[in-house]
Amino acid sequence: MKTMWKHLTDSFARKAAAFRRDRRGNVAITFAIATLPIVGAVGYAVDYSHANNVKAALQAALDSTALMLARDASSMSNTDLNAKALNYFNALFNRPEAKNVSINASYTTSGGSKIVVNGSATVPTTFLGIIGYNDLTVGGSSTTAWGSTRLRVALALDNTGSMASDGKMTALKSATKSLLTQLKNAASTNGDVYVSIVPFAKDVNVGSSNYNANWIDWTDWDNDNQYCSGWGWYYSCTPANRNTWNGCITDRGPSGAPGTSTWDQVATLPNNTAISKWPAEQYNACPVAIKGLTYDWSALNNVVDSMQPNGATNQPIGLVWAWQSLVGGGPLTVPAKDSNYEYSDIIILMSDGLNTQDRWYGNGSNTSTAVDYRMYQTNGSGTCANIKASGVTIYTIHVNTDGDPTSTLLQNCAGSKDKMYDVSKFFTVTSASGIAKVFNEIGTSLTQLRVAK
């Protein structure tokens, strides 16, 4: 390109010199007319380059203006919005040669919140005025969109006995409340963000008021909670009244070893078989009841306040019930999704230790890899893989204050359908104070604004 341009300019210079020496007839006039297109082309290149620089500066100012307007757009009138847009833009756009600057901003909430800022200006020319173009018009547009993707976030929170040490439960409560505030602030309208909370230990609590529900299997509970009297032919047992149940359920599947059953690894609704139903258990370390998807932020905070550390660790049941809270079933109802929006379904699983007991394995004190296998196996089976394959993204957090080995189980569980193993979604902290930082980091990644174009 440079060689061609030099060839043209050299050729033009030689011919121009010849024209200047030639005094015959109208050669001088012809020369002047002939040079006009050349001057115009050179002038256009210079002026166009200058205008492009102004346009780039204008676009950068529009992008920043759109982002800054997004913070308060929902509370401003259209007049105030445009006044604020002009103030932001003028503070950012430092090109005094630009004239007739015009800025227009609009805010809409259909299918999510969106700010659109359009701008234009004229740039005086240096050379093109010779051929009648005294200025060039430049323009741009920037869109900041948020809320076009709605969030549904399930929090599976470890409420086991070990959370009582090192200030972990206190830190978890504080971090969870801060995360709830982040998520609340990300919602411009009700329904933009739903959150569920699943406190877990060995069991989860689905609410004792559901004792008449047809999705509960009472077989083991009736056997374990009965009053027996007499002897011989006169020996008889009477099951306790089910209204004395404390609300806890354990892993789905057969009473004995699960074998090939995978009911504990899916969110499929129960059928009429006992193995598919959720088995009641009078667990003496029953955690606070789960809270299904809601944007009742006060109710969610009340659940957090009620959490107490007690019991053994069964991460698989916390994880599968977090999933259940996103799809519904049992005591949980899920609001319909609006086709005008995209949705991101998220699970955040936080635990401070390794698995110690489920319905079939472990004693609550020692680590049980048999419990781990219900959640993840190297062959790709287990609850983690099932959840990610369904389109739900999993974040996992290991609060390791006891110097345990890093939880490869939680590390392998983190990910999404697009990236089944994603270490960027696994976090490990070695002190209770680290919980807040991780929750904040995850909350920020879920709620950040984006410039759409």
Model-derived regions: residue spans:
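N-terminal signal-anchor/signal peptide hydrophobic helix marking the start
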Residues: 24-35
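Short, charged loop segments at secondary-structure junctions
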Residues: 72-75, 207-320, 416, 420-423, ...
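DG-centered beta-turn motif at the end of beta-strands
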Residues: 156-160, 172, 200, 322, ...
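MIDAS-like acidic motif and immediate structural context at the N-terminus
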Residues: 40-47, 147-172, 176, 349-357
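…and closely analogous acidic/polar surface helices at protein-protein or active-site interfaces
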Residues: 54, 162-194, 201-203, 217-220, ...
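N-terminal leader/signal peptides at the extreme start of proteins
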Residues: 1-24
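VWA/integrin I-like adhesion module and closely mimicked acidic/polar interface patches used
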Residues: 337-344, 353-416
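Short amphipathic secondary-structure patches
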Residues: 2, 7, 45, 49-52, ...
